[in-house]
From Swiss-Prot:
Pfam families membership: SANT_DAMP1_like
Main location: nucleus
TM helices/strands, residue ranges: none
Record region (Disordered): 1-38, 286-317, 344-377
Extent of Low complexity compositional bias: 306-317, 344-358
GO cellular component terms attached to this protein's record: NuA4 histone acetyltransferase complex; Swr1 complex
Similarity remark: Belongs to the SWC4 family.
Record keywords: Activator, Chromatin regulator, DNA damage, DNA repair, Nucleus, Transcription, Transcription regulation
Protein name per the record: SWR1-complex protein 4
Biased composition (Polar residues): 14-38
Organism: Kluyveromyces lactis (strain ATCC 8585 / CBS 2359 / DSM 70799 / NBRC 1267 / NRRL Y-1140 / WM37)
Amino acid sequence: MSSSDIFDVLNIRPKSSSPDAEAQTPTPSSGTVKHNKPQVTGIQRELYSLLGDNTPTVPIKQGNKFKDSLNSNIKPSPWSFVEFEANSHLKLRHWVKGSKELVGATVEPSSFAKFNQHLTIPSFDEQEFQQFMNGNNSEWKYGEVQYLFDLCRNYDMKWFVIADRFNYNGTERKLDDLKEMFYTVCQWYFLYKDPDNPLISQLNFPKEKELERKKYLERLLKRTAAEIAEEEALIIESRKFEMAAKKTLQEREALLQLLDHPHSDKPISQFLTSQGMSQLYANLLNDKNRKRKPDSNTPENPWMKQQQQFAQQRQQIQHQQQFKQGQIIQQQQQQQQQQQQQQQQKQQKQQKPQSDQITSKDQQPSENIEVKTEGQRLNKKQKIELQNALRRKQDSEYAEHLLEKFTLEERKALGVIAHGEKLAPGVYLRSSKISTYKPAVQNKIVATLQELGLPVRPAMPSLEVVQEHEKLLKKIATLLELKKQVDKLTAEKQIVK
């Protein structure tokens, strides 16, 4: 198969090398520069020869992108400048589509007149006013009431505008007085005209409640920032109590469900044998080890959340204090190293050639080392004591921070105490923590208590009783010590005599 056959199959026309074709090709002008194209050989030549006209897959509509010219044959529609009636005493003009013949010469109302709605306020004359009022209000006369009703019609019951514009023969009326008079007159009017009207019950205006509401609002607006914060804190506390009450109710219901278990109808004879007892024990053990789903409806405990926040704050304070302690320890170590270097420099300057001095110098370093080791030990002890003191201080500050919102009376009522020192783990009796003295002093204290008619240990060792008992023991011990010193001085005085 030749190349011409391939061209015929692929519908490709080969390049003709006839002289007629060469003659038809345009000759370049003298001014243009002829660029020789590189000759393509091999596969590239075959690929170039396969290229033909690429037809687009999607038809492209090549239309004119400019706007069409205006059609001047269409006749423009006429517009006319006509009058319209805005209200009964005002006429304006506007443009309307259409000729004057079509629109007409009559003045039409505004298209927005349908939105101009007014309230239906009752109207009456002086005779009707005297009949339905029947002398119920002697302060307001008919002229002033009619003036008020006219203002209400003109300003659509905008009471602040009405109170601002009200000026009847120089009389001053407050906004609440105007409201009260308007609603009372309307109520008496409907009672006179239509006693069965359902609007009568809604026309009652409580003036005293309105004044009280405004005073309360003024007090709210005049609150200080401290009062607002106090109210917010009280609201938060009340919500916490509500959450705690809900939780206690849920726990109480759970306990009642546990206590009020359903009675089984099965006989107990099957559990009287050893096999039945072992089966019952296995069932109870499986029930105990079974994982129960946590109750998702239980509310979050606000006290636990607050304690977690306090614990986080406490950890931050501890980290800061530990960082400060580390800086202080580093400074102390640097000062000690500087002192040691200064001592070594002084010792090197004071060297002498004598043998005694040499021996003494040989002994000095060992002594210095011993002194340094003792100093280092003392420093370590001091560091440990300082750390313990700081920890106790942090614990006491944390406890006081937790209880700062409780007063002394509330602490006493709840029995809450902030211990400054670390307590021993486990349960103990408060009476066992009463301080004891030496046997000789203890016997004298017991004798003194018996003389006073008091027991050695309190019968009801509450917190306050134990504190007062401790104070009493300390005072008795100091008095016994003073008595001992007085007896000693009197004996010496008698010997001198």
